[in-house]
Amino acid sequence: MKKDAGLLFDFDIRVFDESEFHHWPKLPTDLKIKILEYIPFPTLRNFMFLSKDSYSLVTRLKTLVFNVSLSDIDNFKIKEVVVLLKEKKGRKYTYAGVRYNHSPRLVALATLFHFSTYMDIRETAMGLSALDPEEEHLLNVQPTTTVIAKDEFCIRAGASAIVSSFLRFLRPGCRLRVYPLREQKGFFLDTRFFDSVVVHASPAIDFDFTTGATDDQIVLFQCYDITMCVPNVTAKAINRIILEWLEGKREINVYALKGLGNVTKTEILQDVEVVPWEKFLTMIYNGDWWGLRLNQGEGTGLYNGARFLIVLVETDSCQLLDPYFCEK
């Protein structure tokens, strides 16, 4: 190529010979995987089923997926049609249905587990009213290495037993948010649930219903956020949590413990050095804001040399709040 004096840079374009072209099968595996990282997911999924080699490459890729949602659609009368593709042609609409021999819920769960084999799923949200024997069997036969959520797992369940079924598919360090599908008085997570390493390692737990967690279990939680109804937890455990925070061994953003059995501020703050409330308000930059919201004697201020903490105690509840708390 001739050099053009009008160009900002002088350069040559070299045309590759056909012999220098590298066909896909001859590329190194690492390079193939790198190329596949730039492929849109629909194309990637089609590529996946071209051959055994394609399937192996995609499953090794672990495509990053930020959120997967699974809806419980068993309330609908028609269970066969779960996907509708709609194309507008003038004023007419064309529908193409996808039919399955199994219930939509079973197919959705099977698809989720299939996705987990070649996707790096960060968050999963689901709503399940129930699990039938066939669906329970599907969960039971999944490999121990299966992970459906690494950062957050949110479930609205029709029965508390459903929640336990998914616990082994979560990565320790995953935020846990569990809600009854509807207002259910009998919704309860028993004591055994809180022996799980996944629960202990969770940075945030939101279980706004009655649980069977005990003193010995809750002190093992590594959460910075907890919302739980814990009738089996006593002032002794809360006192230990506060002492660990004072020693810098625990991070607290918001702890909202409800359903406690007649706890007192004296028991909770035993052996704890308290900062006088008026002085505490001058130590935090938003002291005026807290001063307007809490009357003298309602809040107790603590300082561990690096962070501040507000303790609020009522007969059946206790809140531990970082005055600068934020939604994490």
Placement of each model-derived feature along the sequence:
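Non-core capping and flanking segments associated with repeat-based/extracellular domains
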Residues: 1-328
